[in-house]
Amino acid sequence: MYQDLIRSELTEAADVLQKFLSDDHNIAQIEAAAKLIADSFKQGGKVLSCGNGGSHCDAMHFAEELTGRYRENRPGYPGIAISDPSHLSCVSNDFGYDYVFSRYVEAVGAKGDVLFGLSTSGNSGNILKAIEAAKAKGMKTIALTGKDGGKMAGLADVEIRVPHFGYADRIQEVHIKIIHIIIQLIEKEMA
């Protein structure tokens, strides 16, 4: 009954991934992001990750696989998702939702740390403010975006952009693949 729809959805997902894969710049940016994070870890730094909605879940997944494990057993790495419900609700109430990530970066981030922000549109105001706060602290920044990069285009030290202009879920599907590869490369760099 839905077989044509299922095939169509999977074909579109494969096409979006193939388009991303066909640009060597994207491959180089993934490697650059992994090296940036591994270099921070080697110097005693940490990575703070953030996103909204599904990207928030991806930010938590990224941090969890750094502190826990990906494919192999190894020491945990200092990854923190900005996801504490009490922090998010406090800052949203007292300052506004645009500040939920930047306030955390201001409080916990340090020179040499890395901010890892995810926004499928590249226009999330709270991620933009987090990038500003991170730069003010001397942190490096990585942005996973989509479409044309939105307002984040060119702001981060490393931007990995999925150039898809359809629904955000296709961008998120590639983002999770990128996250897994970055973790794999970090593990190789740290071995």
Curated annotation (Swiss-Prot):
Pathway membership, UniProt: Carbohydrate biosynthesis; D-glycero-D-manno-heptose 7-phosphate biosynthesis; D-glycero-alpha-D-manno-heptose 7-phosphate and D-glycero-beta-D-manno-heptose 7-phosphate from sedoheptulose 7-phosphate: step 1/1; Bacterial outer membrane biogenesis; LPS core biosynthesis
Residues involved in Zn(2+) binding: 61, 65, 172, 180
Primary location: cytoplasm
Cofactor(s) the protein needs: Zn(2+)
Family matches, as InterPro entries: GmhA/DiaA (IPR035461), Phosphoheptose_Isoase (IPR004515), SIS_dom (IPR001347), SIS_dom_sf (IPR046348), SIS_GmhA/DiaA_subfam (IPR050099)
Cofactor binding notes: Binds 1 zinc ion per subunit.
EC number per UniProt: 5.3.1.28
GO biological process: D-glycero-D-manno-heptose 7-phosphate biosynthetic process; lipopolysaccharide core region biosynthetic process
Binding residue positions for substrate: 52-54, 65, 93-94, 119-121, 124, 172
Reaction catalysis annotation: 2 D-sedoheptulose 7-phosphate = D-glycero-alpha-D-manno-heptose 7-phosphate + D-glycero-beta-D-manno-heptose 7-phosphate
Gene Ontology terms: cellular component: cytosol
Additional facts recorded: The reaction produces a racemic mixture of D-glycero-alpha-D-manno-heptose 7-phosphate and D-glycero-beta-D-manno-heptose 7-phosphate.
Task performed by this protein: Catalyzes the isomerization of sedoheptulose 7-phosphate in D-glycero-D-manno-heptose 7-phosphate.
Family: Belongs to the SIS family. GmhA subfamily.
PANTHER family: PHOSPHOHEPTOSE ISOMERASE, SEDOHEPTULOSE 7-PHOSPHATE ISOMERASE / DNAA INITIATOR-ASSOCIATING FACTOR FOR REPLICATION INITIATION
Name of the molecule in the record: Phosphoheptose isomerase
Species name: Vibrio cholerae serotype O1 (strain ATCC 39315 / El Tor Inaba N16961)
The organism's taxonomic lineage, starting at the top: Bacteria, Pseudomonadati, Pseudomonadota, Gammaproteobacteria, Vibrionales
Designated gene of the protein: gmhA
